[in-house]
């Protein structure tokens, strides 16, 4: 959700 988090968490 947060954009500051690394893309790996989005996966």
From Swiss-Prot:
Q: Which UniProt keywords apply?
A: Antimicrobial, Secreted
| Leader peptide range in chain numbering | none
Instruction: Give the subcellular location.
Output: Secreted
Please give the chief subcellular localization of this protein: secreted
User: What tissue specificity is annotated for this entry?
Assistant: Expressed by the venom gland.
Task: Say which domain of life the source belongs to.
Answer: Eukaryota
Instruction: Provide one Gene Ontology cellular component.
Output: extracellular region
* Protein name (database record): U1-poneritoxin-Dq2c
């Amino acid at each position: 959700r947060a954009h500051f988090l690394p893309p790996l968490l989005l996966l």
